[in-house]
Amino acid sequence: MRPMMQFVFLAALALLLPTASIAQKNSSPAGAEQASLPHDSHSGITVSAKPLTDSSRAKHIFGKANPIPAGVLPVEVVLRNDTNAPVQIGLDTIQLEIHYQSGRMDGVDSLTPAQAASVIAHPNGPAAPRERRFPIGMAPIGDKKANKFLETLRPLALNSDIVPPMGTIHGYLFFDLRHDMSLVSQSSLYIPDAMVIPSKKPLIFFEVSFADR
């Protein structure tokens, strides 16, 4: 029964992977450009990443949802899999690690697209609660400004956690640096969780340094 279940899993995965690959592969950097990006590579997996600190460039990409004026750093990430097995990346555990000259280190968690949109819409923090205008039990009106920005950010974000065999995925991660972009030059992108599926074989962490970039 176990071999049959594994076959069914692989068959289902084969149907899903092309969609994930196509969704984020079209806009990925060309091979030569990708090779020039800061990267870490082992076990047949290459993680390339580039922090975007130029506000005018960010505005060209994100439009009115430009994260930089709100103190949020967008990081372009390309994940390439040169093996014959799919690899799963733990998106929820990715951090931007800040390495201070004193030796202290801080980890900044990545924001979801919804969290990033909220910070961009309200860079000074959420508005103070207002008096309820609707009867209890009725759904409140959503944050229209944040939702509008989310429509821009979501398709650009790194939202697939599966890197298909011999495939590439590409997108942006967002980190709230509270307007201190000087931290970028002493930071690195840290990806602690990656594994080969369906064997669930863990891979050593990936770390891409942005020092002096």
Say what each PLM segment does.
Residues M1-F7:
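Positively charged n-region of N-terminal signal peptides that target proteins for export
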Residues T19-A23:
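Sec/Tat signal peptide C-region and signal peptidase I cleavage site
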Residues Q24-R213:
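Conserved functional micro-motifs across diverse proteins
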Residues F7-P18:
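Bacterial N-terminal signal peptides
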